Amino acid sequence: MYALIDCNNFYASCERVFNPTLIGIPVVVLSNNDGCVIARSNEAKAIGIPMGAPAFEYEHLFRRYKVKVFSANFPLYGDMSRRVMSLLSNYSPHQEIYSIDECFLNLEGINVDLQKYGLEMKARIEKGTGIPISIGTAPTKALAKLANRIAKKFPNETGGSYVIDTEEKRIKALKWLKVEDIWGVGRRNAKKLYAIGAYKAIDFVNLSEAWVLKNMTITGLNLQKDLKGIPTIEMVEPEKKKSIGTSRTFETDLRSFDEVRERITTFTSMSAEKLREQNSFCKRLIVFIGTNPFKEHETQYYPSIQIKLPFPTNSTLELVKFAHEGLKQIFKKNHYYK
């Protein structure tokens, strides 16, 4: 069984940890240039502020509902993420940190009531960090993602922890989930699925494997098998290396500088944590990004830059600062980065 733990409204929740008077008040976090909304509390969502919204278009709502607006503080969020992930590592020896606010745990061999185990995790994290989380548990990673979505969507019914542990639950969940909300499907594949009348995850699962392989490649086929309950998407666990690095393929193509910088911040923070764990320091930093190689009709771009640091460090704040400087030098507009 796998558990997917997701921090709820992470950036907004981090701001509330350090200012509890914000609890119950609409909170939004803006990108570093204060251009777009990149995080919203549930209260902000309820008054109609969408993710990615240009801030100036919603200033009237900010004033009307007394919304508290913050500029993104990525070093703070990275530090809070490390605290959460460190506590979660106590619940399984096999952890994959998927993003700044998500991680997978492999629960193989842990023979307990998994619903209660999830609730125990939730209570421990919220007590230890102040960050609210949701937990989804299932036989595969894709199903754990789905279970997490249910836990987050129906907190009163689930308590924030939901387990897909029967065929009946799996089928019911697949009938509920829209294809565009399936982990890793993306807009492009969702359009293909809609075109053939596949609107729910159950429709995708019931498609022939030949069609999925032809139209969605081996990645889509592995996803389909995972949703069938056949473990196909494996855990990505850290390796012990003298050269420390963190890289991931983005879940969706990213175009804006702020979106890419957010991911770079997350990965740099994770690398800094690895440095400190083995009492090491960094003297050189390499930042690299790349476009989607499967979009052959678009211009490909795979830049990298090596930065010689003025002093050895394992400080998240320092490394993030240098990583941002490097990204500014290699980032080009009008590319979709993967």
What residue spans do the PLM features occupy?
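DNA-contacting surface of Y-family translesion DNA polymerases
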Residues: 194-337
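Gly/Gly-Pro- and Ser/Thr-rich, intrinsically disordered tail segments characteristic of DNA damage-repair
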Residues: 1-225, 235
